[in-house]
Amino acid sequence: RSFALYNEEDFLQLSGIQHYEFCRRQWALIHIEMQWQENVRTVEGKILHENAHNPGMKEKRGDLLIVRAMPVHSREMGVSGECDVVEFHKGKDGISLAGKEGLYTAVPVEYKRGKPKEDDPDILQLAAQAMCLEEMLCCTIPYGCLYYGEIRRRVKVEFDTAVREKVRKIFAEMHRY
């Protein structure tokens, strides 16, 4: 597949895909017109994310390396953003990490305030994070996890071809604005 690479000054905010898919008007107000109103729900969401977003914090638990607030980008999709958490699981296959022994597989984890939804804006955001990581780390990431604060549980999300194509299509649409 041939594609053009975006310049950094044309990058969109990765998190915008969630707003765009949920409500294009909301996305335009936040990301184009820079209008944002805090409310109880957004403040609760910010508090939940503060636990995940401790920039540069790395934590090792046995064969698990946890990186918080990891910056990611994709020149192919023209986006940049931050993963709440990326877990690197040590195993028999995967990628090598600088300064670490062995091979690791990456699993992005996105924190959400509420509970699982019927539609897929959260899934698209998580898939976009995985696709950025794949481009940056030259690997394949088959799944990630959404952690929902309201139910205090993770939901595993598989990244199939349909989800990946939808992410690419939506970012291409967003770039036209």
Where do the PLM segments sit?
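Metal-dependent nuclease catalytic cores that hydrolyze phosphodiester bonds in DNA/RNA
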Residues: 1-108
